[in-house]
Curated annotation (Swiss-Prot):
Record's protein name: Holliday junction branch migration complex subunit RuvB
UniProt entry keywords in alphabetical sequence: ATP-binding, Cytoplasm, DNA damage, DNA recombination, DNA repair, DNA-binding, Hydrolase, Nucleotide-binding
Region feature Small ATPAse domain (RuvB-S), mapped onto this chain: 181-251
The species this protein was found in: Wolbachia sp. subsp. Drosophila simulans (strain wRi)
Any one Pfam family match given in the protein's UniProt record, by short name: RuvB_N
Length: 324
């Protein structure tokens, strides 16, 4: 099985690859999703067909890219990766699709960022396994049809609502990734420490998990930074005291909140009534998309913020936390 990235600018974060699971049985968390995915893969293999198209959606850092790679390995087929912003014209998409072999997996990250003209080309590729490309200009324009082998498209998005209904409906296997439980994160951190040859105490692993916002990517990033401090100080293991000290230096509090989170909460705290997302974006000098994708999901999960038709509202729980 080959793993190939398409496009000059698509550089998938390879820093976590060595501590990522490589098969579904090793994947921690998302239990129901994994069990269902095993059934779909086994059924496709039994019928010797390409797996139906898969849409992975949910907050950032929950394992969408990892799952896509695992699916290709379980299917024993080649894996090709690109991202929505790189496919700016039909020729870009055609260049990727025409290199696929039967049953290969094509992974499109940030698929919600595809422009509508590319989506329309993708419709026939997904449904009929062919490409209709316009050739020529003006009166001499004609449609060139290119047949494609059956393949599996795996799309990943943090913004499901930005996908057009026609594109969304063409995915036969929509899978929602949820935030991870505390114990699942502890297990992920322990496994990561073993792979990194870093000795870690149970209390330290649990403290990192407490501040990881239910997100494996964050948990592993924090683990790596703590390991840096331990190695520089020539300590033998990651203890609770070391983990707590480093996390505070990194600006991560006991709830896993960082400076941007706190600025967001304080702005709502000091503003009367519901506040619109555009107002928050201007006040914090942050992109609306970044706030909606990386800040709000966790704050909503821990019941610190509510979204209402009139805007964002701080909960009593958040007000109490800010008053501590």
């Amino acid at each position: 099985m080959k793993s190939i990235s398409c496009g000059k600018e698509y550089t998938e974060d390879v820093r976590n690859i060595n501590i990522r699971p490589e098969q579904l049985d090793d994947f921690v968390g998302q239990k129901d999703l994994i069990q269902n995915l095993k059934v779909f893969i086994n059924a496709a293999q039994t019928r010797t067909e390409a797996l139906d198209h898969v849409l992975l959606y949910g907050p950032p850092g929950l394992g969408k890219t990892t799952l896509a790679q695992i699916v290709s390995k379980e299917l024993r087929v080649s894996f090709r990766a690109t991202s929505g912003p790189l496919l700016s014209k039909a020729g870009d998409l055609a260049a990727v699709l025409t290199t696929l072999n039967a049953k290969d997996v094509l992974f499109i990250d940030e698929i919600h960022r595809l422009n509508r003209s590319i989506e329309e080309v993708l419709y026939t590729a997904m449904e009929d396994f062919c490409l209709d490309i316009l050739v020529g200009e003006g009166p001499s324009t004609r449609t060139l049809r290119i047949d494609l082998p059956p393949f599996t498209l795996i799309g990943a998005t943090t913004r499901l609502g930005l996908l057009s209904a026609p594109l969304r409906d063409r995915f036969g296997i929509p899978l929602h990734l949820e935030f991870y439980s505390f114990e699942e994160l502890v297990n992920i951190i322990k496994r990561g420490a073993r792979v990194l040859s870093a000795e870690i105490e149970e209390d330290a692993a649990r403290e990192i998990a407490c501040r990881a916002r239910g997100t494996p990517r964050i948990a592993l990033r924090l683990l790596r930074r703590i390991r840096d401090f331990v190695e520089v100080k020539d300590d033998k293991k990651i203890t609770y005291e070391v983990a707590d000290s480093v996390l505070l230096k990194l600006g991560v509090d006991k709830m896993g909140l960082n400076k941007l989170d706190m600025n967001y909460l304080r702005f709502l705290f000091n503003t009367s009534g519901p506040v619109g997302i555009d107002t928050i974006s201007i006040a914090l000098s942050e992109d609306v998309g970044n706030i909606e994708e990386t800040v709000e999901p966790y704050l909503i999960k821990i019941s610190f913020v509510k979204r209402t038709p009139r805007g964002r509202v701080l909960t009593d729980q958040a007000k109490e936390y800010l008053s501590l």
